[in-house]
């Protein structure tokens, strides 16, 4: 396969390919990217574990919204477990030293988190749409039964889309490094622009349209309810719901839009200019990918905040857990203080007694 590709590669293109360093920014990236992903790892893991603990403690009160949220939390936790290897990779200047098998697994976890997260956020918006706009069409029991089937379907769909990553090599030996899960590693894939454009439409554009339609309908319903019943507006329930909706949409757009826009515009450029793009264009795209992927991965840190502000029970439980932890720390400190003073007094008395014996 390599021989055939070499036959179709002109000498000028080959020299351009070899002279183009797409990782020239590694000196800056090896500082900023590990720092960013370390923050994502800590906040994402702690926040999502807290959310999972609260959900497990309230499993008897589970509903369709909680079910989708649980799967979203599991997806985020799964992603954070793969971050230490990525942090090491970026800290070494885009050099993967632990084999292609682990590289493939990391890539699998990354894409599972990305598109499982998008799908479950879409499911949440549809679920809220039926709960608020059409509450009589599906009762609570039916929504839970459907939610279980939908969650299973989403995981099967995402695994089906990402499992081919385990078949294809994800790492590539460069002159100075071994890269992992980088775009140039599979740039020669046949019909890649069309594959990525299709993935962007199914994995981003379609979910975004569904989310915007669902939440806009929910907002209209809330405004209509507020006009019919002024007490709901005075209670502040509608305002809180609207603020939560705005927050969810902003998080989705800010985290996922830049990455998919970067992919779409570069793939369109490749289709319009089938030949090898200039090195500066390719390098700019590579930098934009690293930046937008960092932004997209930050989404797993924002999900716990959505639960915190949107779910009254979750907020109350978290605050209760934190208060309990603080009270335990204070009580242990108070208990240890007299013990410390008593121990110091005993040691002082022993020293005095020892000196008096020596004096004799």
Curated annotation (Swiss-Prot):
It comes from Bos taurus. Homodimer and heterodimer. Heterodimerizes with CXCR5; leading to modulate the interaction between of CXCL13 and CXCR5. Glycans are attached at residue 7. This is G-protein coupled receptor 183. Residues 125-133 are annotated as: Interaction with G proteins. 7alpha,25-dihydroxycholesterol binds at residues 86, 111, 115, 259. One of its GO terms (cellular component) is nucleoplasm. Residues 1-30, 95-104, 168-191, 265-286 are extracellular. Residues 339-360 are annotated as: Disordered. The gene is GPR183. Residues 57-76, 127-148, 215-240, 312-360 are cytoplasmic. Keywords: Adaptive immunity, Cell membrane, Disulfide bond, G-protein coupled receptor, Glycoprotein, Immunity, Membrane, Phosphoprotein, Receptor, Transducer, Transmembrane, Transmembrane helix. GO terms for molecular function: G protein-coupled receptor activity; oxysterol binding. It holds the Pfam family 7tm_1. Belongs to the G-protein coupled receptor 1 family. It is a multi-pass membrane protein. SUPFAM superfamilies: Family A G protein-coupled receptor-like (SSF81321). The keyword Electron transport does not apply. The lineage of its organism: Eukaryota, Metazoa, Chordata, Craniata, Vertebrata. Disulfide bonds join 103-180. The modification Phosphoserine is found at residue 327. InterPro entries: GP183-like (IPR047160), GPCR_Rhodpsn (IPR000276), GPCR_Rhodpsn_7TM (IPR017452). Residues 347-360 have a biased composition (Polar residues). G-protein coupled receptor expressed in lymphocytes that acts as a chemotactic receptor for B-cells, T-cells, splenic dendritic cells, monocytes/macrophages and astrocytes. Receptor for oxysterol 7-alpha,25-dihydroxycholesterol (7-alpha,25-OHC) and other related oxysterols. Mediates cell positioning and movement of a number of cells by binding the 7-alpha,25-OHC ligand that forms a chemotactic gradient. Binding of 7-alpha,25-OHC mediates the correct localization of B-cells during humoral immune responses.
């Amino acid at each position: 396969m390599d021989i055939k590709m070499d036959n179709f590669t002109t000498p000028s293109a080959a020299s351009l390919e070899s002279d183009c360093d797409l990782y020239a920014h590694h000196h800056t990236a090896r500082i900023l990217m590990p720092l960013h992903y370390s923050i994502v790892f800590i906040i994402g893991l702690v926040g999502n574990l807290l959310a999972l603990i609260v959900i497990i403690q309230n499993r008897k009160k589970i509903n369709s919204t909680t079910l989708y949220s649980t799967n979203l939390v599991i997806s985020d936790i799964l992603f954070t477990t793969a971050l230490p290897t990525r942090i090491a990779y970026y800290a070494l200047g885009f050099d993967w030293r632990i084999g292609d098998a682990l590289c493939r697994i990391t890539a699998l976890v990354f894409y599972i988190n990305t598109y499982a997260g998008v799908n479950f956020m879409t499911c949440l918006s549809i679920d809220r749409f039926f709960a608020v706009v059409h509450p009589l069409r599906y009762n609570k029991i039916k929504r839970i039964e459907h939610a279980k089937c939908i969650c299973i379907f989403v995981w099967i769909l995402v695994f089906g889309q990402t499992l081919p990553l385990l078949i294809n090599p994800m790492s590539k030996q460069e002159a100075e490094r071994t890269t992992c899960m980088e775009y140039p590693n599979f740039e020669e894939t046949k019909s890649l622009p069309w594959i990525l454009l299709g993935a962007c439409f199914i994995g981003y554009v379609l979910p975004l349209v569904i989310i915007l339609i669902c939440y806009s309908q929910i907002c209209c319903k809330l405004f209509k309810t507020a006009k019919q019943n002024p007490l709901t507006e005075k209670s502040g329930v509608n305002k809180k719901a609207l603020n939560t909706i705005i927050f969810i949409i902003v998080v989705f757009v800010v985290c996922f839009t830049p990455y998919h826009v970067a992919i779409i515009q570069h793939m369109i450029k490749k289709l319009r200019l089938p030949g090898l793009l200039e090195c500066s264009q390719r390098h700019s795209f590579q930098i934009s990918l690293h930046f937008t992927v960092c932004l997209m991965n930050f989404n797993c840190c924002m999900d716990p905040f959505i639960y915190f502000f949107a779910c009254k029970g979750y907020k109350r439980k978290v605050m209760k857990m934190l208060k309990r932890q603080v009270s335990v720390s204070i009580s242990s400190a108070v208990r240890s203080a007299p013990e410390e003073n008593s121990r110091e007094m005993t040691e002082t008395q022993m020293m005095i007694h020892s000196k008096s014996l020596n004096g004799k």
